[in-house]
UniProtKB/Swiss-Prot annotation:
Protein purpose: Receptor for persephin (PSPN), a growth factor that exhibits neurotrophic activity on mesencephalic dopaminergic and motor neurons. Acts by binding to its coreceptor, GFRA4, leading to autophosphorylation and activation of the RET receptor. May be important in C-cell development and, in the postnatal development of the adrenal medulla.
Gene3D superfamilies: GDNF binding domain
Name of this protein: GDNF family receptor alpha-4
Organism expressing this protein natively: Gallus gallus
Protein's GO biological process: glial cell-derived neurotrophic factor receptor signaling pathway; nervous system development
Glycosylation: residue positions: N180, N296, N308, N339
Location (main, coarse): membrane
Lipoprotein recorded as keyword: yes
Pfam families on file: GDNF
Lipid-carrying residues in chain (GPI-anchor amidated serine): S403
Length: 431
């Protein structure tokens, strides 16, 4: 009965997610904007504003003009557009997204939106239901990590892409005792983007009770090439490198968004979705900030870096590192996957809150409030009187593009109102 209810819940969630994610993607929005003289002109201006991070070097007048441009584009088809993870021309799509959001989000450590559509990928419902249907004892009595490897070898795509990334990651460069990390990372991203989660999640998050199992799990991403190096760099180096790349910046933003910890929810996740958190986690594997299990004796996860010698960016560095090492949402999601309850996030967190988690909660709330003020400050009539001409110029854009998007926003609102009670009822029957 429990497995059947999970099965029904998954189908329901995917159907609703697809309905909500039917909004315009940023590639389409960019093409529409290019074909509109008014939008196209403002978009070119915005590109100039953020070129080479030049916004920090602009004078007051130039900054005001850039703010005016952003304000006008808030009512265009560009604002609110999303991208799909692993889509064709993903980098191009994300460049359009960040052209708008780079300005709005500048200085924010915690993002209040994800560049990607809230899409639940095609899970194998029968397989997942069978895994989660048994009791916790039944799940942990078998070697799930070994079973995961066997299951991947049976599936053609999983076996082929796994063999491909392992081949790239273990291959040594000629006349050097190092691997080609760039090719290794690219092959890893391809694997986690294309192979269904019922295989990738089982390989990464399988529960272990002995070191042999835990070592197999740790070796999943071939850490000698994809993760480790002779010395641990300061975390700010890979973080800065990530922010300079559209794809990595977006995957990290999705991870922040979907794995954001909270002390206000029973699950420990602000978004109350373990599945979304785990999927976001797999998205940053194969990036400059690739995380992994730190050893074969625990389930602790961290990127390969340290916050020593961070200077005046010490707090920023520690906030980044603690998103992995002290994140109740991520830790609970991994544990819930192990005992077969990760599809039902409405369970009490098994990890006690720490001082750092309280600090993360305060920072998240502060960032959310500041972000809201920054965006809507530009929209107050008393503050945009001088920009009336620009806003008038965008009237046609607003009337043409805001209406089609309205059903998507309404659907999202209805989903937020309807989904929690529905899951609560389902979880009641699963007990």
């Amino acid at each position: 009965m429990r497995g059947i209810l999970y099965f029904c819940t998954l189908i329901l969630l995917e159907g609703m997610a697809e309905a909500v994610s039917s909004s315009r993607d940023c590639l389409q929005a960019g093409e529409s904007c290019t074909n509109d003289p008014i939008c196209s002109s403002k978009f070119r201006t915005l590109r100039q504003c953020i070129a080479g991070n030049g916004a920090n070097k602009l004078g007051p007048d130039a900054k005001n003009q850039c703010r005016s441009t952003v304000t006008a584009l808030l009512s265009s088809q560009l604002y609110g557009c999303k991208c799909k993870r692993g889509m064709k021309k993903e980098k191009h799509c994300l460049s359009v997204y960040w052209s708008i959001h780079h300005t709005l989000m500048e200085g924010m450590n915690v993002l209040e939106s994800s560049p990607y559509e809230p899409f639940i990928r095609g899970f194998d419902y029968v397989r997942l239901a069978s895994i989660t249907a048994g009791s916790e004892n039944e799940v942990t009595q078998v070697n799930r990590c070994l079973d995961a490897a066997k299951a991947c070898n049976v599936d053609e795509m999983c076996q082929r892409l796994r063999t491909e990334y392992v081949s790239f990651c273990i291959r040594r460069l000629a006349r050097a005792d190092t691997c080609n990390r760039s090719k290794c990372h690219k092959a890893l991203r391809k694997f986690f983007d294309r192979v269904p989660p019922e295989y990738t999640h089982e390989l990464l998050f399988c529960p272990c009770e002995d070191t042999a199992c835990a070592e197999r799990r740790r070796q999943t991403i071939v850490p000698a090439c994809s993760y480790e190096s002779k010395e641990k760099p300061n975390c700010l180096a890979p973080l800065d490198s990530c922010r300079e790349n559209y794809v990595c910046r977006s995957r990290y933003a999705e991870f922040q968004f979907n794995c954001q910890p909270s002390l206000q929810t029973a699950s420990g996740c602000r978004r109350d979705s373990y599945a979304a958190c785990l999927l976001a986690y797999t998205g940053i594997i194969g990036s400059p900030i690739t995380p992994n299990y730190i050893d074969n004796s625990t389930s602790s996860i961290a990127p390969w870096c340290t916050c020593n010698a961070s200077g005046n960016r010490q707090e920023e560095c520690e906030s980044f590192l603690h998103l992995f090492t002290d994140n109740v949402c991520l830790q609970n999601a991994i544990q819930a996957f192990g005992n077969g309850t990760y599809l039902n996030a409405a369970t009490a967190p098994s990890i006690s809150p720490t001082t750092q988690m309280y600090k993360q909660e305060r920072n998240a709330n502060r960032a959310a409030a500041t972000l809201s003020e920054n965006i809507f400050e530009h929209l107050q009539p008393t503050k945009v009187a001088g920009e009336e001409r620009l806003l008038r110029g965008s009237t046609r854009l607003s009337s043409e593009t805001s209406s089609p998007a309205a059903p998507c926003h309404q659907a999202a609102s209805l989903l937020q109102l309807w989904l929690p009670p529905t899951l609560a009822v389902l979880s009641h029957f699963m007990m």
